[in-house]
Amino acid sequence: ATFTVINKCQYTVWAAAVPAGGGQKLDAGQTWSIXXP
């Protein structure tokens, strides 16, 4: 399965996914796709 994290805030956030790979800095409007087994 693939999960997509979308930062809909107007500021930078730090998203985390454990144990899928730690964290990711997301600027406003940025997305992060995470593949889970």
UniProtKB/Swiss-Prot annotation:
UniProtKB keywords: Antimicrobial, Fungicide, Plant defense
Q: Which GO terms describe its biological process?
A: defense response to fungus; killing of cells of another organism
Entry-linked PROSITE patterns: THAUMATIN_2 (PS51367)
Matches recorded under InterPro entries: Osmotin/thaumatin-like_sf (IPR037176), Thaumatin (IPR001938)
Summarizing the function annotation, the protein's role is: Has antifungal activity. Inhibits the growth of Trichoderma viridae and Candida albicans.
What family does the Swiss-Prot or TrEMBL record give for this protein? Belongs to the thaumatin family.
Report what the protein is called: Antifungal protein S
Which organism does this record belong to? Hordeum vulgare (Barley)
